[in-house]
Amino acid sequence: MNPPKEFNMDSTTVDPANSRVLEIIKKRYSCRRYRSDQVDDPRLDVMKEAVRWAPSACNRQPYLFNFVTDENTIKEIAQSVPLGPASVNEWIKSAPLIVAAVGQPELLWHKMTQVIDTDYHRTDAIIAMDHISLVATELGLGTCWVGWFHRKKVGKILKIKSGEEVVILMTVGFPESQPSSRKPRKELDELIVFK
């Protein structure tokens, strides 16, 4: 899939007041209840393309994304919590799809960046995962980031290679319902400073 023909980086033709991307960002929310329908192939294809076109340090794309649809594997992942009762992630079982971002911290490039205390493999994988989240929202899907999971256990479940690491998980599916209201956000002056 190539960039759309109407793709135009000419800033003089863009109307900032009508940002389609910002509208999608505002619509995205953490969905924890899904319908049982599987995510169809056309939607999966767009999510896969979002991974491919995501930026990464030096365009190395140092990750592999696992699209997990097997119900038993999803249940196993939901049980793999680092601490406390597994019931904290019970909601994950309703998702028809879990996307697992697997980073490659052992690549020479990433080992070199450790001198500056930067985990590029994680940063790159999370950027690509956010691209999935946004296109999924545009396609009428719900998503939720899952940070409370046991990396090594999930890595074993997914049979990832030695030297790789499960960076982050995301549930994806058709929402059971839409939220009745949006969660409040901080004021811009609490979040952004110009210097």
Language-model features, listed with the residues they occupy:
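Acidic, surface-exposed loops and disordered segments
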Residues: 1-195
